[in-house]
């Protein structure tokens, strides 16, 4: 088993290296919705808990964490993305135990961009209605515990982006591994490869133009071909360690490195404190080059800090209700607020 795991880790690292790009490629990929974390608890740590995240939230960071679902889990989250823009994210997921060591999960994320005025060459000021882009992705995940120390998972995700007369769709895959060791499983390592798939292309009636060529008597309809665009593939490597662990308090330090194919690499860290059985406090920071010094080379609206709080509430025999809130600072805009509800049955 250790030999097979080592080979799989080496394959993920080698495959991921081929995707490692540079910031000069920023803006040349599409389907950027795949880079937005829709879940509340992990946003409170700026996503730095990829090596320790469990349950449905792991379907975004490291799918190996889904293997820790004990029976059934249902989750919902709502994000007010970049406050003031009117953009909202809604995410819904369900996971269930399959067999003795496997977990099957389904997650759906939709992104609402609000109503955008329709403008044309003849009516550049609008006044003829509005349109609403529809961005969504649906993921099917299978995760498995191979031993008491080794966990792995794979996700197939269908991606869709459209307006009324133009649409693009595609399929991508995520894979992840987690290794757990140390006293009371207090040390965890993770690696994940995300958003790997074939290029996507927009198509539809919106790419046609009807015009009458000079000297012609009849109008012609011309179809304009769109260019393909790549998906924002990345490799994520993380570690988590319980720095305090006793009957009443568990404090976990988390860290991660993200190698992005189409933007700057990122480093993140965070602390999660479980105080008793009810209260959870979270704080994190995500750094990339140029974030602290500012200037024209800043390529993200996020300024780094994140924080959150969670409450665990008993919900009957064998069931737990978890309420989470997180906030991430941005400049400009008014930050990103995320509320989440999870029920373990």
What are these regions (language model features)?
Residues 1-2, 341:
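Generic cytosolic/nucleocytoplasmic N-terminal low-complexity/intrinsically disordered segments
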Residues 2-10:
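Sec-dependent signal peptide recognition
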Residues 10-11, 70:
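Short, linear, compositionally biased motifs with a strong N-terminal bias
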Residues 19-345:
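Subset of outer-membrane beta-barrel
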């Amino acid at each position: 088993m250790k030999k097979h795991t080592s080979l799989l880790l080496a394959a993920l690292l080698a495959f991921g290296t081929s995707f490692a790009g540079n910031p000069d490629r920023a803006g040349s990929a599409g389907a950027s919705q795949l880079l937005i974390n829709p879940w509340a608890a992990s946003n409170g740590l700026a996503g730095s808990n990829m090596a320790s995240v469990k349950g449905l939230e792991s379907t975004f960071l490291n799918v190996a964490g889904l293997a820790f679902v004990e029976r059934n889990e249902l989750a919902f989250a709502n994000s007010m993305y970049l406050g003031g823009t009117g953009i909202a994210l809604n995410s819904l997921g369900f996971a269930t135990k399959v067999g003795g060591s496997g977990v099957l999960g389904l997650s759906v994320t939709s992104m609402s961009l609000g109503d955008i005025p329709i403008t044309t060459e003849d009516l550049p000021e609008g006044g003829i209605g509005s349109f609403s882009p529809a961005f969504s992705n649906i993921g099917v995940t299978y995760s498995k515990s191979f031993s008491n120390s080794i966990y792995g998972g794979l996700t197939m995700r269908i991606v869709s982006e459209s307006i009324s007369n133009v649409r693009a769709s595609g399929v991508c895959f995520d894979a992840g591994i987690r290794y757990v060791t140390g006293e009371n499983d207090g040390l965890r390592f993770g690696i994940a490869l995300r958003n790997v798939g074939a290029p996507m292309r927009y198509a539809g009636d919106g790419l046609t133009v009807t015009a009458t060529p000079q000297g012609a008597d009849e109008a012609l309809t011309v179809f304009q071909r769109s260019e393909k665009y790549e998906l924002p593939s990345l490799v994520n490597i993380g570690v988590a360690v319980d720095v305090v662990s006793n009957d009443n308090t568990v404090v976990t330090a988390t860290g991660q490195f993200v190698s992005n194919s189409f933007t700057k690499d990122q480093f993140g860290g965070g602390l999660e404190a479980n105080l008793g059985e009810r209260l959870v406090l979270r704080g994190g920071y995500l750094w990339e080059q140029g974030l602290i010094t500012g200037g024209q080379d800043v390529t993200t609206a996020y300024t780094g800090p994140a924080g959150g709080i969670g409450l665990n509430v008993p919900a009957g025999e064998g069931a737990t209700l978890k309420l989470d809130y997180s906030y991430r600072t941005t400049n400009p805009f008014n930050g990103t607020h995320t509320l989440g509800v999870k029920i373990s049955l």
